[in-house]
Amino acid sequence: MIALIQRVKQAKVDVDGQTIGAIDKGLLVLLGVEREDDQAKMEKLATKVMSYRIFSDEDGKMNLNLKQVGGSLLVVSQFTLAADTGRGLRPSFSGAGTPEQAKQLYQAFVDYCAAQGVPVQTGEFAADMQVSLVNDGPVTFNLQV
């Protein structure tokens, strides 16, 4: 399971010209599911995302996590993160989870984070989405479990 996380000042996701999810300070999470992923991997990744210390403390050091700064999550499904780009000029998605598996784990990720008290907004699974953000830093990390 892969999460590309970006520290943002604000982010939103639109579908068909309508904003369906928006946050101010927090993390934009692009979430990719791979074939071997399961509930345990999802929980491990969700915990890591929420606990990852990428917000600055009073000394300017990355020492605070999402909950410590009162931030929110915008979680967007992104199957292309599971692409194999090692050969050729066209990505292969053979390692990506099935749509059913990905949808279930995506929703479980959202629910798990919300249950931990983190405000969560989402995109629409498998929709054509337009994501806008103001990246803070920029600070971007690729987390994988």
From Swiss-Prot:
It holds the Pfam family Tyr_Deacylase. GO terms for molecular function: D-tyrosyl-tRNA(Tyr) deacylase activity; Gly-tRNA(Ala) deacylase activity; Ser(Gly)-tRNA(Ala) hydrolase activity; tRNA binding. PANTHER family: D-AMINOACYL-TRNA DEACYLASE 1 (PTHR10472:SF5), D-TYROSYL-TRNA TYR DEACYLASE (PTHR10472). It comes from Shewanella loihica (strain ATCC BAA-1088 / PV-4). Homodimer. An aminoacyl-tRNA editing enzyme that deacylates mischarged D-aminoacyl-tRNAs. Also deacylates mischarged glycyl-tRNA(Ala), protecting cells against glycine mischarging by AlaRS. Acts via tRNA-based rather than protein-based catalysis; rejects L-amino acids rather than detecting D-amino acids in the active site. By recycling D-aminoacyl-tRNA to D-amino acids and free tRNA molecules, this enzyme counteracts the toxicity associated with the formation of D-aminoacyl-tRNA entities in vivo and helps enforce protein L-homochirality. One of its GO terms (cellular component) is cytoplasm. Keywords: Cytoplasm, Hydrolase, RNA-binding, tRNA-binding. It catalyses: glycyl-tRNA(Ala) + H2O = tRNA(Ala) + glycine + H(+); a D-aminoacyl-tRNA + H2O = a tRNA + a D-alpha-amino acid + H(+). Its main location: cytoplasm. This is D-aminoacyl-tRNA deacylase.
